[in-house]
Amino acid sequence: MFPYKYLTELPQVALLSKQVGGAATATLPNTLMSAFTRLDVKSLQLDAIYPLEHNGGGMFAIGNRALIVSKRGKFFLYDSDDAANVRDLDISVNINYQEFLSFVNSKGLDDKIVQNWFRFIDVLYHEDSSGKSLLLSHYYWHAQDECFTVRISRLNVPEDGELENVSATTDDWNTVYDTKPCLKIKPKGFYFAGHFSGGRMEFLKEDELLFTVGFLGFDGNASDYFYSQGTDGDYGKILKLDLQTGQATDFTIGQRNPQGLTIDSKGRIWSTEHGPQGGDELNLIEQGANYGWPYVTYGTDYGTTRWPLSESQGRHDGYRLPIFSWVPSIGVSNLIEIQGFLPEWEGDLLVTSMKQQTLFRMRYREGRVVFVEPIKIDLRIRDIDQLDNGNIILWTDKTWIIELTPGENFITPDIADFVRELEEPEKQQAINAIHSCHVCHSAAPGGVIETAPSLWGVFDRKIAGSRFRHYSPALRSKQGHWNEETLNLWLEDSNGFAKGTSMAYPGIANPAIRKAVIDYLKALQ
């Protein structure tokens, strides 16, 4: 009936809030709107309860619970059935963070780079024939050799033990794999480009793990050398690890910073990857494929309009093409395939982003993406997973845990009900007038988009009284509410009603058509 192009939010009434130190935590909206679908929200901000740093860590769903590791390696267990009480787990891991800080300070380097990017990346909980274990990806500083790697560590969980009761010290972890070679700090560009980590893990089968590794700033542009196209290093690739032998082989090459990885119900492997300034990618991963970095990209070097290593700018010629690319970049992070959430969403991919602070629902059919629906969250989304109850759970850079559930959908009134008493051509003119409203305005509950406020609930609402941020001064200066009288004046002559309004239009001269539009607006409740 009308275009839904943007996510919308209801007023900010939180489902969850905690008293911490005598003050309530911040809250998030308790409802979001996607296209024709209301999403209910449960949310909790961990750093209002525990002292945590922002921008890092990962999450893994276990039944209706989620295991979370923070940027600095603190573990938490979130339970969908008891969402207000997150368990702090007694698990410690050493990555030699303080030693790396001391090293860069001794060299007179800016240690904020280490503080920001030397962190924990991803976590998996795994059960197989050999037992239960936690797998963790993170940076590790090799103090004796003065170099760093991306490491996978493993913690065996007692067979009869519950995860919330596990206690582990740094000595209880085993090293599964360290990326090769161990990297010295760079003399060019960022000395430690830790924001290009990759680090995502996904089981291919019981003893085989896929592991994404970012290029760590070694791209032949901000460095004199790169590893992503050679055989002498792991960086800029997706590796296949044999967990029995600890050996790694290149599964794919030519990646830049693959921060998302999932295997869908058909066995297809999907990865999301950061491009440079533009060119974030959704890739369908096939063993042995070369995805082209750093020779090709749909992005450019930062602050320029070109990527210096590309012979053909912006073409991605000669290498495996992405299934989809975002230009400009969205700051892509992880992704999942949606199963058992909503019938309308079944089998779609849900891609998260940091820069755009948005979920992207993507439908892949017959070899192509047929649509992409943005769902604005307004927080940097670091990770995503789906619980056994079907709910979608997000981990954000500001330590919010957000759980999304399908809500009861609103019903849009049938336009035909409001034009029955009109004769042609007035009937069609009234239908056209109502449709023209929805060229700019949403009719979703609480809908707030960039172009115009939602019409839902407009009747009896204060004039210029919604959460829309871009009302004209002319409309903001008006007193009163939208009722039959004020709506009639507005529809007849908007500029006469609010001189200087940014929404001046010719108006509707026919009072019968104006009445049909007003009756329709009254029904949007």
Regions found by a protein language model. Give the residues of each.
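Acidic, Gly/Ser/Thr-rich repeat motifs that build Ca2+-stabilized beta-propeller blades
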Residues: 6-215, 268, 328-367, 387-404
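C-terminal capping alpha-helices of c-type cytochrome domains
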Residues: 390-392, 406-410, 481-525
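Conserved blade-ending motifs and adjacent loop-strand segments that build the rim/top face
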Residues: 368-389
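Hydrophobic membrane-insertion alpha-helices, especially the h-region
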Residues: 1-3
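Beta-propeller domain segments
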Residues: 15-39, 86, 110-113, 118-120, ...
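Sequence/structural segment immediately N-terminal to covalent heme-attachment motifs in c-type
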Residues: 418-450, 455-456
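Gly/Gly-Pro-rich "capping" loops immediately C-terminal to redox-active cysteine motifs
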Residues: 445-484, 505-507
